[in-house]
Amino acid sequence: MIKGIGIDIIEIDRIGQAISKNNGFMDRIFTLNEQRLFEEKNNIMETIAGHFAAKEATAKALGTGIRNMKWKDIEILKDSLGKPYVELHNNAKTLADSMHIEQILISISHNKSNAVAQAIAI
């Protein structure tokens, strides 16, 4: 049973600007595991923007948006085949558990200017 759906789109340039203007942006938004994934990519800005959109989409699927949780409470990782998956921590996990959410499915895509992600909580 679907318990929540979220979608987010972001301009890749906005992420680049946020990183340039705010020294703490990456550490505030992304876990060390996520940052390690970015280091492995050639198209790093597209990947970072996609992960940011995935966090937003996941928060929307939980029905709250980012309020009442921290960005790092939602972690977007990749399996051995490169498929993204969501790991929830702290307040995000507590909320998902209270909603009896067993899994959040995530899909991420981008073109040269935008990144988009959709999350489905089941």
UniProtKB/Swiss-Prot annotation:
Give the UniProt keywords, A-Z.
Cytoplasm, Fatty acid biosynthesis, Fatty acid metabolism, Lipid biosynthesis, Lipid metabolism, Magnesium, Metal-binding, Transferase
GO MF entry, a single one: magnesium ion binding
This entry carries the following GO cellular component terms, namely: cytoplasm
Keyword Transmembrane in annotation: no
Example GO BP: fatty acid biosynthetic process
| Keyword Mitochondrion among record annotations | no
Q: Which InterPro entries match?
A: 4-PPantetheinyl_Trfase_dom, 4-PPantetheinyl_Trfase_dom_sf, ACPS, Ppantetheine-prot_Trfase_dom
| Catalysed reaction equations from the record | apo-[ACP] + CoA = holo-[ACP] + adenosine 3',5'-bisphosphate + H(+)
This protein's cofactor list reads: Mg(2+)
Binding annotation for Mg(2+):
8, 56
**Listed EC numbers:** 2.7.8.7
**Biological role stated in the UniProt entry:** Transfers the 4'-phosphopantetheine moiety from coenzyme A to a Ser of acyl-carrier-protein.
- What is the protein name given in its UniProt record? Holo-[acyl-carrier-protein] synthase
- The species is Alkaliphilus oremlandii (strain OhILAs) (Clostridium oremlandii (strain OhILAs))
